[in-house]
């Protein structure tokens, strides 16, 4: 995964539809929830109140029967020109499990949305004695396969 460095990132405020995420890798050798190339759920990310290298974010999952949501508790963005990497910390509810996650989204901003998007998710804390969601400290990598995460008007 490319981390776009720099202290002059583009303004990424807006709503983006991540609707073509494909699984690439997991750090957990026992994680069999996905195999390479499997599609992931669709997400809508909302970035707002960007001030320099700080930005706020929320997300929700758009999948029938799944009501995952998260509220950002802090985000830092790096990059320069149109390329950026945003480091997000969320309080989330995933498949009914309260948890905290850290997400990295890296890509290039265009007038249509975000191209070359890579999405990394790790859970840092969870209330999940049944291990319904991924293990704490492991991570999964997804790519927005052969398309742009389109900018949206409604969250």
PLM regions: where:
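Amphipathic/hydrophobic helical signal segments and adjacent flexible N-terminal regions
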Residues: 1-34, 146-155
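Generic short beta-strand segments
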Residues: 15-26, 58-62, 85-93, 102, ...
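Short coil-to-beta strand junction motifs in C2/discoidin
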Residues: 36-42
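Contiguous, well-ordered beta-strand patches that form the walls/edges
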Residues: 45-112
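Glycine-rich, aromatic-bearing surface loops/beta-hairpins
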Residues: 97-155
